[in-house]
From Swiss-Prot:
This is Lipase member K. Its EC number is 3.1.1.-. It is found in: Secreted. Residues 78-377 form the AB hydrolase-1 domain. GO terms for biological process: lipid catabolic process. Keywords: Disulfide bond, Glycoprotein, Hydrolase, Lipid degradation, Lipid metabolism, Secreted, Signal. It comes from Mus musculus (Mouse).
């Protein structure tokens, strides 16, 4: 967000502008963590630590019921929501309750769980490794699919007493599901339905800024970004979110930053909540994860991380080159939504993905949707969530 630095300095140096103070309103949620935000809207919550097989500790949040529901009821069907790249569980609760999927599901009578990927703001602990060490950050979406997703699903089912759950993934949250559900048959049996929002398998045609990483060598990327964390939320970005982007004067500038990452759809963004949207973004990931995405852009395949030389690949995969994941092996019933203005999950990549989904039960392309509309869009309840909840209800009746 360096482009905002000059703007901020100009604002601070120039002093008051006509109407400037009157337009400065910060939403209280912009300074809240996940548990505080859930409580703020009157919902109950639980915080659980998922411990993966390789020692990562993942912060997982539960909304066991809606505002008007009693805790003392029969076991509820479980819905597990998993965010995308450099994001967090905050995505599912950052809008008003009538526009946030997690709250809508809770009010519809479901037991809602919000996952956080390793290395983000809420999942930055380990049984043995320090986040200050490069060893902690030696992961990508391979490990999220192999370790994070199974561990989280198993804990959720254990705590809820259920045998299956409904899985909702956005962006990278769909990527790790495609991998996990196609390579781990026992895990796949525990998924009743898979809802894929802005699904990402290949990124051959992506137009997102991450494509710029492909112009750099691995060595250059590590010189620029190091070998640990990539793009975490800083005090400066929090300042921009709560002191600049909360002002109507800068709504267009701040929203254009979001659109540059996701695609253009200004009519569908609640500008009055820009400070909330930006206050916990980005939530961070590993440099290795970003290198893996750059590899995916170059290869045009959904492939395991290339460790850089045949010996390393042989050690990890028992073959000289990283294996390609075969999504067609996934048998989980799957519903998908894609966006016509999505610069991350490009329409051509989605078109190539569709025939590989062996049990596709529903697909909808929304022409005006960008990558973030699936959790930020003001019309998401009408375009996506209504049908998603209906499919859950129909599945439970069968």
């Amino acid at each position: 967000m360096w482009w905002l630095l000059a703007t901020t300095c100009c604002v601070l140096l120039s002093g008051p502008i006509d109407g400037y103070k009157q337009e400065s309103i910060t939403n209280p949620e912009a300074n809240m963590n996940i548990s505080e935000l859930i409580s703020y809207w009157g919902y109950p919550y639980e915080k659980h630590d998922v411990i993966t097989e390789d020692g990562y500790i993942l912060g997982t949040y539960r909304i066991p019921h809606g505002k008007g529901c009693s805790r003392k009821t029969a076991p509820k069907a479980v819905v597990y929501l998993q965010h995308g790249l450099i994001a967090s569980a905050n995505n599912w609760i950052c809008n008003l309750p009538n526009n946030s999927l997690a709250f809508l599901l809770a009010d519809s009578g479901y037991d809602v769980w919000l996952g956080n990927s390793r290395g983000n703001t809420w999942s930055r602990n380990h049984l043995r490794l320090s986040p200050k060490s490069p060893q902690y950050w030696a992961f990508s979406w391979d490990e999220m699919a192999k370790y994070d997703l199974p561990a989280t699903v198993n804990l959720i089912l254990e705590k809820s007493g259920q045998k299956q759950l409904f899985y909702v993934g956005h962006s990278q949250g769909t990527t790790i599901a495609f991998i996990a559900f196609s390579t781990n048959p026992e895990l796949a049996k525990k998924i009743r339905l898979f809802f894929a929002l802005a699904p990402v398998a290949t990124v051959k045609y992506t137009r997102s800024p991450m494509k710029k990483l492909t112009t750099l060598s691995r060595k250059a990327v590590k010189v620029l970004f190091g070998d640990k964390m990539f793009s975490t939320h800083t005090w400066f970005e929090q300042f921009i979110a709560t002191k600049v982007c909360n002002r109507k004067l800068f709504h267009q500038l701040c929203s254009n930053f979001l659109f540059s990452l996701s695609g253009f759809d200004p009519q569908n963004l609640n500008m009055s909540r820009l400070d909330v949207y930006l206050s916990q973004s980005p939530a961070g990931t590993s440099v290795q994860n970003m290198l893996h995405w750059a590899q995916a852009v170059n290869s045009g395949q959904l492939q395991a991380f290339d460790w850089g030389n045949p010996d390393q690949n042989m050690m990890h995969f028992n073959q000289l080159t990283p294996p390609v994941y075969n999504i067609s092996k996934m048998r989980v019933p799957t519903a998908m939504w894609s966006g016509g203005q999505d610069v991350v999950a490009d329409a051509k990549d989605t078109k190539n993905l569709l025939p590989k989904i062996a049990n596709l039960i529903y697909y909808k392309e929304i022409p005006h949707y960008n990558h973030m509309d699936f959790y930020l869009g003001q019309d998401a309840p009408q375009e996506v969530y209504g049908d998603l909840i209906r499919m859950i209800e129909e599945s439970l009746q069968n």
